[in-house]
Amino acid sequence: MKQSILILLVWQFAFLWQPIQATETIKVACVGNSITYGTGITNRDADSYPAQLQKLLGKKYSVGNFGKPGATLLAHGHRPYIQQEEYQKALDFSGDIVVIHLGINDTDPRNWPNYRDEFVHDYLKLIESFKKVNPQCRILLAYITPIADRHPRFISGTQQWHEEIQEAIKVVAQISQAELIDFHTPLYPYPILLPDAIHPNEEGAHILAQTAYSAITGDYGGLKLPILYTDYMVLQRNTPLRIHGTANTKTPVTVSIDGQKKKTIADKNGKWEVILDPIKAGDNYELSIQTPQQSHTFHHVAAGEVWLCSGQSNMQFMLQQTQNGSTAVSQAHNSQIRLFHMKGKWETNASEWPTDAIDSVNHLLYYQTTSWKECTPNTSATFSAVAYYFGKMLQDSLKVPVGLICNAVGGSTTESWVDRHSLEKYFPAILKDWTNNDFIQDWARERALLNLKQSTNTFKRHPYEPCYLYEAGILPLQQYPLKGIIWYQGESNAHNMEAHYRLFKLLVNGWRDNWNNPDMPFYFVQLSSLNRPSWTWFRDSQRRLMNELPHTGMAVSSDKGDSLDVHPKDKRPIGERLARWALNQTYHYSLLPSGPLYKKAISKNNEVIIEFDYAEGLHSSDGNPLTGFELAEHEGRYFPAQAIIEGNKIKVYTNQVKNPQYIRYGWRPFTRANLVNKDQLPASSFRDKIQ
């Protein structure tokens, strides 16, 4: 009898438990278009983003896929979601959580240009409909996924309308108090995951699933910090310091250093940050970042001056390779200089990369894992010579720790360092079919194709590809606080001065935007002398760029060139000339930052008077008469001219030109022009119309 009663009770308990279990299952409705549906994915039932989200969430959740290919958010769009069968099914599902990803198809010219004013209204109405069937439901609005530049309508409106729709979604979230999740940023650096320019493949869908999973659960993988947070790190002194990272939602985070203790809580997107009070220069701080579950303590932390050193092979050129390199390396003992050396895993030399290398490069995993190191003969030997000499002169002058981050890549193009949004908006033509695009230097394209010869992917990624090094080498720095940037690049863009002129401005302004510092110092090296015909014009374009871009300075290197070698070995003067710009312009030291820089030329009685900046003590570098000046009445027909120093000005004349209209100096690919100032700093070559 007792056994029968026990069995009955167990049966009744089991019967009662089933509905309890069912009501505890959390229903997630994934509402959207073909991206939610899984168009283009071979096995969408297993690999669409909702299917992968189900795997991540587990049995406590029930995920429904209510994606409709071609659906628009707009009620007057060409295929309104609210008129589709999937919409009614989503309502009937009555999700506890509703993830909405709509808006991609609204970029169609049939939709956004005509009905943009209805977008916010229609989105709010859609949200209300889900709230009506489940008043307690949690609404997650997704920023729309990227559309790659390969899309046929990209430049005819799609790119601009895509941005406008993102802003409209933000407005909807503000009004409705819905949560915003970002389906755009995680996919944006990976256009190869969008084979048809719109639909993510399985891997792309996994990124969306992971994004939704973290937003739903608050699980962001625990405490994570930027790659630059290591022992021996250098923090920028004398300025409020942003220390940041990610952690699981609502996790308390405590940051401590030098008696400061700042506390915060990770937000719903897993992000946290604190602002430390300015720290004075020093070299033995301890930085602690803690959550209740995890702790990171960084030892031997310094506070001083932090500079990013970037560009191509002449910035990458190692200290041990330079003139007198062995002596310089043996003397490179300085714990006040710290190096963060970002080396590529594979050299961009004349070889075919293995398939595993190509796969890593496709995933932006080009750089080796590294950490901050004190400057020693061992750590400095393979470090950038230009950066080392720059940092050494700064440290000798400022007497504070100096941190140097170097991510230069040999042969890299200017466009590879420019952010994707800038190129999409202001120079989209350079993105198109980049390995066959003559905006990009033929040598760079040929070398990239050789490295990628074993690739089976239709879309190829490489450090010379537009945007690549920005995405692989700048974004991972996560806006680490810097004082400024030094740059040595241009050899791989000298074939097209006009394109570089546009690209360089995009690069400088884009990097300043990334660091939220419109006045960030940016000092760069003018190309040296070499027997390449286009370099005369290119050097002058660099000079003009310096005049147009504020807070920049240009180190002249033409006197240190090699007529046959693109990699001159005398790097010390170049690094020190960059340091002069920093010491004068950034740290306000009273030293000449540069050699004579052309200001203007005025015609007077068939003679030309040239004025310069930084013209103190003008003379010739070799004791001989000045050489390299030419005059012309008609552009293209120049004659050598005599030049005489008159105080801080130069008088130029020739009997062969009676009415001079144009002047140029040092106008040879490999120039022996010899004008310098009192500090033996060479004048930049130039060309201009005479006033």
Question: What positions do the PLM features span?
Answer:
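Alpha-helical cap/lid subdomain in secreted, periplasmic
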Residues: 23, 55, 59, 78-222, ...
